Amino acid sequence: DLWHDIGWGWRQRAEAEHPVYWLPNGKDSWQMRHFDQTIDLPLHQPLIHVNWYEASAYCNWAKRRLPTEIEWEVAATTEPASGGKEFSKTKRRYPWGDDGGNDAATLSRANLDGRGLGCVDVAAFAAGDSAWGIRQMLGNVWEWTDSNFEPYPGFKADSYKEYSEPVFGTRKVLRGGAWATRSRMVNNKYRNFFTPERRDVFGGFRTCAPHNWP
């Protein structure tokens, strides 16, 4: 019940028992490959090298789920109003506000531009929190969403239509950029798209849970 049928088929073919590049270290601990080294699993960094099927199966096990693309964007872009029960009409360009797009503006707010030479602690960069208090929505790792990669309303292909148009509906959306993403490129609407079986060094995920509004 934890796995999608296609995801379970992938797991059987790949003989996947754990995230790629993980190595068992005794009975209850793990190590992982980090460039050309073997290190203890960093428990306070994002999980990487997991595909969409694995992320979705974990969410089912944890009784949580992946956010949809629009949920991710609302969490990054909007501000609370009416005592936190509604969204304001204000939309931010970056989770922390409208100041960004360069090294200086993101230096204390996001792990971008390769500065960390890899992932950093999930508690780092508090100055980059969204209006809802959500941390590291930009940088560190690309985050899987539950949504298929589809065109925005009014989409028109430019001269590079072969870049995205042929794969609409066949990829899953990731949001947020990774530690190697250039700060001049990333903002709250920046998208990426991977095949659901791709286990990428720059890809991870965050989970969400249903919330009952009062």
Predicted regions span which residues?
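Short, structured beta-strand segments at or near domain termini in extracellular proteins/domains
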Residues: V201-P214
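Short, P/G- and charge-enriched loop/turn segments at secondary-structure junctions
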Residues: R191-P196
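A generic structural micro-feature
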Residues: F168, E197-R199
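Functional-site microenvironments in short loops/helix caps that host divalent-cation chemistry
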Residues: D1-Y190
